[in-house]
């Protein structure tokens, strides 16, 4: 029986990225891999940290270095993860954001092959790239109006921890990225593995709707 291919998870980071938006989900995936290896199974997730620039200052001032460039092609199956940025509105009028949006517009999402995961106002970035048109999505409550304004064809859902619409998975923000990744681990691996990861991270397996 052929081995299940690993899922490549691409965290696309801009300057000012909210650290908890990506660090929490990344840790969930790391712990999932660790648990699988402890059971004698292969790791399931390969994490990539990509950016228009090789160095980026995060929301808390920590500097990320050695970021990989935005790839011309993605190993599949793959998830592209977009996260929120510091500030009340998402600034896309800068070279880094324009480069990321250009790259995002070239993605061809397909369930089980190339999927989008947004945390917090990462959904607004996705909307600027046209990836949420005709889709239902959520975002941080402070960005719900902005999301609706950026793409009037996106069905914006309030009061949701996370939701899924085809190949698009979105979450409300900050710690809810962990909730969403636990759900994705449960879907792609097993509910038991998701429960082990939640226990290791000392978080609830599922909060709210």
Q: What feature does the model see in each segment?
A:
Residues 1-116, 126-128, 158, 186, ...:
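Extended, subdomain-level signal for the structured scaffold at the beginning of enzyme domains
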Residues 6-8, 136, 167:
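Residues that mark the start of a beta-strand
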Residues 26, 30, 148, 178-182:
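Predominant activation on well-ordered alpha-helical scaffold segments within soluble catalytic domains
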Residues 87-89, 123-125, 133, 145:
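Glycine-rich nucleotide phosphate-binding loop and flanking beta-alpha elements
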Residues 124-131, 163, 177-178:
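Acidic/polar active-site rim loop that often engages polyanionic ligands
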Residues 133-161, 196:
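A conserved active-site-flanking secondary-structure segment within enzyme catalytic domains
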Residues 164-198:
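Conserved anion/nucleotide-ligand pocket segment
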């Amino acid at each position: 029986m052929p081995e299940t291919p690993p899922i490549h998870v691409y965290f696309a980071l801009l300057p000012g990225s909210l650290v908890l938006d990506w660090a929490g989900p990344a840790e969930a995936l790391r712990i999932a891999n660790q648990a699988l290896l402890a059971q004698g199974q292969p790791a399931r997730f390969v994490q990539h940290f990509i950016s228009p620039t090789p160095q980026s200052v995060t929301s808390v001032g920590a500097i990320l270095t050695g970021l990989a460039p935005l790839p011309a092609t993605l190993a599949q199956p793959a998830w592209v993860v977009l996260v929120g940025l510091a500030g009340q509105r998402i600034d896309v009028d800068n070279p880094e954001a324009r480069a990321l949006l250009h790259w995002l517009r070239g993605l061809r999402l397909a369930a089980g092959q190339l999927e989008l995961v947004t945390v917090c106002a990462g959904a607004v970035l996705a909307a600027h790239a046209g990836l949420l048109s005709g889709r239902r999505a959520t975002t941080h409550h402070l960005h719900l109006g902005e999301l609706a304004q950026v793409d009037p064809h996106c069905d914006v859902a309030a009061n949701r921890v996370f939701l899924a619409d085809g190949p698009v998975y979105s979450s409300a923000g900050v710690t809810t990225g962990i909730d969403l990744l636990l759900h994705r681990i449960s879907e792609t691996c097993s509910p038991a593995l998701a429960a082990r990861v939640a226990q290791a991270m000392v978080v609830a397996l599922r909060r709210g709707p």
